[in-house]
Amino acid sequence: MSCDPPVDDADVPRFWRELGLPGLVDVHVHFLPAPVQAKVWAYFEAAETHYGAAWPVHYPLPEDERLAVLSRLGVRAFPTLPYPHKPGMAAWLNDWSHDFAAAHPQVLSSATFFPEPEAPHYVAEALDRGVRVFKVHVQVGAFDPRDPLLDPVWARLAETGTPVVIHCGSGPLRGEHTGPAPMTGLLERHPRLQLVIAHLGMPEYREFLDLAERYERVHLDTTMFATDFTERLMPFDPGDRPRLGALRDRVLLGSDFPSIPYPYAEQLAALARLDLGDDWLRAVLWHNGARLFGVAA
């Protein structure tokens, strides 16, 4: 690698500049309505109960300060990625996210959905308003992505090619419908879906690499991947690094900002430590996300 990994957040711009990049595209960032964000952070405060490990949120800041942090880091484009945990939430989350993106040009307009009769209507409405990415969280939502109520939604998204960031792996918590089997079934029905597998599918990394190799529109995001925090809990087999290298054009930078238990720079340093080369880093940190979401340099 031609440049050293960043040592802290202040060093991040030096890192991407030395790679010859105009900044970063992060496909896994959360901005949520204040009451929802407060509940998320309260959950992480009790992480030892939920996960058996502490999860000290590194950026528990007011909204404007979080936006400023991303700007200083050089994150040029990012989504809000709302997700519901029960029926009746998705439509108002979508309205909030639409308004937030309209107020901040660096934000990729985001939306979500839940298996409920209204889903095809509000997904169509989001598409008509120019949504650029959807978010689905299988474990938090506690639903099967193959639910028949979602068939018309998936069919429409396969047709439009709109990316869907989907948390479907069994980490950090297993759910009834997490893991590769439900996603395999979904892709067998809708092979043209433009999916972004969050967290590289941890801990089922290998099985989700299989899916990315099998389906040309399946991508993987790096959220929390290869960091010291994650490696202690859900290690990645170094023997699979060549497969990750071969999928260079479909791996996307993700961070889970702001609710990460370490500085943002640690995610970038972890990716650099994989030693997959500068071209791989350039693709992951900028080019792939910029291409998928139409972000200009």
Give the positions of each predicted feature.
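Mid-to-C-terminal alpha-helical segments outside catalytic/metal-binding sites
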Residues: S2-V27, V36-A77, L247-R250, P261-A297
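Histidine-centered divalent metal-coordination motifs
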Residues: H28-A34, H167, H199
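Catalytic pocket-lining loop regions of alpha/beta-barrel enzymes
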Residues: C3-D8, R132-V133, F143-L252
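Short, acidic/polar
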Residues: P60-L70, W92, P115-A126
